[in-house]
Structures are given as structure tokens and as C-alpha cells.
């Protein structure tokens, strides 16, 4: 049973019923997914920033944002408006073009990665056969922007931050890719929808986290490092590098870095839920629920209900990991740069390789349980 509705098909059919041609209806549909992607990512970031402030306040026994909107929910929006009206400063003797392009090179690939994130069977922008591979490829572009920003700023702290960002990304991209490859091996594909469908047959027992506990830990640690979250925020360590590659940035350029960091955090949490925790699938298979209720699986109201519940489940799982990442930031000390590189090259890389080989062996030995 499909746990979603075909939004594109229904939108085009609705426009055709109004007298528009199929080609024109399809043309009107094209900008909508990108607009939806921007809205979903931006709202997700606003919620993540608000959670960051409230959770950090709770950890430190403070109140946090309180007056701007109910429970301070509009505080991130106020911050964004404040940064819009700040002066855009260009440092002396800096490289104007690289300095301007740096934030865009960081943010654009992260937003584009949302096209592969599924919230339901048909609730995604593009069901690409190489979806997860596309995300890994796009995530490898962002460090180039950080290096550009650090180099172009004509500041030693910015340059050190950019170099650290490049070294950190290279160190953790490979373990991240190995963890994803192990999941793709079990799912017999790199598409995010295929990966979720493979986990939905038996409910919670089908989730990849039970068959890939080592891969899940490798992926989660590497994802935190890619997001530059504590304890892996070496590129912008305030106590060492002022603000790292962000030191000379102000106004909207600084806001783009800030936005990119939280968009990447929410994206990583969504992908953890998709790859290891069944994405939109429920702990109890929805087919079982439909049979217990005595309702036909093709019932349109049931399809809509399952679509809404699928989005809810995806967000609950994702924001649990956002909460975990925020909690780690305020409870774990920062590692040194040598410890960070040792963790990536001497621990996560060998563990990721062993996990991949172990997955291949188990797939051959137990093909039913491991997707043979």
C-alpha cells in the first residue's frame, strides 16, 4: 500500500479539469516543489534555532526566549530581520568575488539536498535512483565555500578556520559514505524511497538501526562532524579562532552561514530517520492498522490520513536527533584538532570498512534478513 498521495498527478489533473492543457499544467507545477523545499527547510531551521535556545537555557537553568511570540517562538525570525538591516562590510585587501561567493557555495548545495528527502511514498520533490549518492556529492561542495570564505577574508583566523573545515570534511566524508553504502547494500538501491520501503514491511523490527548499529553510530558521529556541531566545531572555535571563517562576515552573508549550519543539521537528522529509523513508516505497519480497522487500503481518506501521519512520524524522528545534537553541544567539551583527525582516520574509517565487509558477508549468509 502506498502511504501517501500523488501530489503532482492530482495537481495536474485539477488544472486540466479547469481547462488547462497538460503541458501548461505541468509547467505550473515545476516551481512549486522548489518553493515547498525552501519553505520546509526555512521553517525547519526556525524551529531548530528556537529549540537550540530553549534547550540551552534549560541546561543552564535559564528561561531563554520568552517575549517575542508565544514562548519566544518568533525570536529566530527577529534575529533574521535584524541581520537583514545590518551593514554588509567588505574587509580591506580581501578578494571581493570569493568573499561574496563563499556563503552561497555553502548554502545552495545544502538546500538542494532536500530534493531527495521523502516525507511519504510520493511526498518528495524528486525520487532519484541515486538519491543518497547525490546528497554525498552535494555535501562535499560546502567545504570549498568555507575554504573560499577563509582565504578571501584576509584574516589569519578566518584562514585557519577554512583550512580546519576542509580537513574536517575530508576526514569524515569517507566514513559517512561507507555507512551509507552499507545501508544501500541492504536496500539494493540508493533511492531514499527504496530505503524506507525496505524498512516498512514489519514495522519497527524492519528498521535498519537493528541490522546496522555500528553503521548508525558511524553515520551519526560523521554527520555531527560534517555539520560542525560540538564537540566537532573546530573550524569556528570561538575560544581559539574568534569565529573562524565567519570572523569578517556581517549582515546577510553571516546570516547565510548561520542558516546553512542549521539547514544542514535538520537535513542530517532527516536522513538519519530515513536511513536507519524507517522514515515515514510507523512502528506498527500501516497495513496492519488498516486491516484491524477493517478499512480498504485504497480508501482516499485513509491515504490522506497516512500521508499526514507519515509526515508527522518523519518530523518526530528527525527532531529527536536535532534535540540530541543540541543536548550534545551543551554537555560535551570540544575535542582538539589532532583528536578530531585521529577519530576520523584511525577509528571511524576502519570501523566503517569493517562494517561494510560485515554487511556484505551477512547479506550472503542471510539474504532474507539482510536484503539479499
UniProtKB/Swiss-Prot annotation:
* Principal subcellular localisation of the protein: membrane
Q: Name one Pfam family in it.
A: NADHdh
Subcellular location(s) per record: Cellular thylakoid membrane
Q: What is the uppermost EC class here?
A: translocase
EC number(s) reported in the record? 7.1.1.-
**Reactions the enzyme catalyzes:** a plastoquinone + NADH + (n+1) H(+)(in) = a plastoquinol + NAD(+) + n H(+)(out); a plastoquinone + NADPH + (n+1) H(+)(in) = a plastoquinol + NADP(+) + n H(+)(out)
Q: Does the keyword Signal apply?
A: no
Could you provide one GO biological process annotation from this protein's UniProt record? aerobic respiration
**What keywords sit in the KW lines?**
Membrane, NAD, NADP, Plastoquinone, Quinone, Thylakoid, Translocase, Transmembrane, Transmembrane helix
Gene Ontology CC: one annotated term:
plasma membrane-derived thylakoid membrane
Keyword Transferase part of the UniProt annotation: no
TM segment ranges? 27-47, 65-85, 97-117, 128-148, 176-196, 204-224, 254-274, 308-328, 347-367
> How does this protein assemble?
NDH-1 is composed of at least 11 different subunits.
Biological role stated in the UniProt entry: NDH-1 shuttles electrons from an unknown electron donor, via FMN and iron-sulfur (Fe-S) centers, to quinones in the respiratory and/or the photosynthetic chain. The immediate electron acceptor for the enzyme in this species is believed to be plastoquinone. Couples the redox reaction to proton translocation, and thus conserves the redox energy in a proton gradient.
What family classification does the UniProt entry report for this protein? Belongs to the complex I subunit 1 family.
Q: What is this protein called?
A: NAD(P)H-quinone oxidoreductase subunit 1
The root-end lineage is: Bacteria, Bacillati, Cyanobacteriota, Cyanophyceae, Acaryochloridales
Amino acid at each position: 500500500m502506498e502511504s501517501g498521495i500523488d501530489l503532482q498527478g492530482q495537481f495536474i489533473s485539477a488544472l486540466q479539469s479547469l481547462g488547462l492543457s497538460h503541458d501548461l499544467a505541468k509547467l505550473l507545477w515545476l516551481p512549486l516543489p522548489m518553493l515547498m523545499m525552501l519553505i520546509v527547510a526555512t521553517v525547519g531551521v526556525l524551529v531548530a534555532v528556537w529549540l537550540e535556545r530553549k534547550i540551552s537555557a534549560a541546561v543552564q537553568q535559564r528561561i531563554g526566549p520568552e517575549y517575542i511570540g508565544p514562548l519566544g517562538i518568533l525570536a529566530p525570525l527577529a534575529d533574521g530581520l535584524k541581520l537583514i538591516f545590518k551593514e554588509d562590510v567588505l574587509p580591506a585587501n580581501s578578494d571581493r568575488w570569493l568573499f561574496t561567493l563563499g556563503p552561497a557555495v555553502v548554502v545552495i548545495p545544502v538546500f538542494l539536498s532536500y530534493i531527495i528527502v521523502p516525507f511519504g511514498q510520493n511526498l518528495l520533490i524528486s525520487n532519484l535512483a541515486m538519491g543518497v549518492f547525490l546528497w554525498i556529492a552535494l555535501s562535499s561542495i560546502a567545504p570549498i565555500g568555507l575554504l573560499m570564505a577563509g582565504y578571501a577574508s584576509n584574516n589569519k583566523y578566518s584562514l585557519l578556520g577554512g583550512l580546519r573545515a576542509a580537513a574536517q570534511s575530508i576526514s569524515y566524508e569517507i566514513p559517512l559514505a561507507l555507512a551509507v553504502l552499507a545501508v544501500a547494500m541492504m536496500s539494493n538501491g540508493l533511492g531514499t524511497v527504496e530505503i524506507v520501503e525496505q524498512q516498512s514491511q514489519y514495522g519497527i523490527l524492519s528498521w535498519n538501526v537493528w541490522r546496522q548499529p555500528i553503521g548508525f553510530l558511524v553515520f551519526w558521529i560523521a554527520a555531527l562532524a560534517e555539520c560542525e556541531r560540538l564537540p566537532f566545531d573546530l573550524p569556528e572555535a570561538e575560544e581559539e579562532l574568534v569565529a573562524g571563517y565567519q570572523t569578517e562576515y556581517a549582515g546577510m552573508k553571516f546570516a547565510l552561514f548561520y542558516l546553512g549550519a542549521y539547514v544542514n543539521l535538520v537535513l542530517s537528522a532527516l536522513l538519519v530517520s530515513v536511513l536507519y529509523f524507517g522514515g515515514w513508516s510507523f512502528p506498527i505497519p500501516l497495513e496492519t492498522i488498516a486491516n484491524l480497522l477493517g478499512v480498504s487500503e485504497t480508501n482516499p481518506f485513509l491515504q490522506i490520513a497516512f500521508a499526514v501521519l507519515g509526515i508527522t512520524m518523519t518530523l518526530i524522528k528527525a527532531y529527536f536527533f536535532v534535540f540530541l545534537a543540541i543536548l550534545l553541544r551543551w554537555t560535551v567539551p570540544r575535542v582538539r584538532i589532532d583528536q578530531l583527525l585521529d577519530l576520523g582516520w584511525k577509528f571511524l574509517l576502519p570501523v566503517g570498512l569493517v562494517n561494510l565487509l560485515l554487511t556484505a558477508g551477512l547479506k550472503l549468509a542471510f539474504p532474507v534478513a539482510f536484503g539479499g
